[in-house]
């Protein structure tokens, strides 16, 4: 078992991550330098398994996504670019900040085999 960062995200944060990664993928594809790992990470984030709650009153849907260091950097950079874009157009950024904070504070855990 490898040690990877566990990004435990809500459904909204998962959607933000997928949108941010797909935006980065489209930008790189438009430049003529597609980077397939970004697309694969977006698909993995979309298909992330639900977190198993230990207590019955935990109602918030959480999803577990294990990230190696390169994937963690891609997720961090993509969410930061989305946050910067939202600042530039004057939209609220509270949700993007929460998603970025959760990615930055992801701890190393024993990841299951892929």
Where are these regions (language model features)?
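Positively charged, low-complexity terminal tracts
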Residues: 1-114
């Amino acid at each position: 078992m490898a040690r990877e960062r566990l990004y435990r995200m809500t459904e909204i944060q998962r959607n933000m991550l997928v949108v941010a990664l797909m935006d980065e993928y489209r930008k790189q594809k438009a430049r003529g330098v597609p980077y397939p790992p970004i697309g694969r990470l977006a698909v993995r984030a979309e298909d992330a398994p639900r977190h198993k709650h230990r207590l019955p009153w935990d109602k918030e849907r959480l999803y577990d996504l294990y990230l190696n260091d390169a994937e963690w950097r891609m997720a961090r950079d993509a969410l930061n670019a989305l946050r910067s874009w939202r600042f530039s157009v004057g939209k609220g950024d509270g949700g993007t900040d929460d998603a970025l904070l959760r990615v930055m504070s992801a701890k190393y855990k024993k990841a299951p085999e892929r």
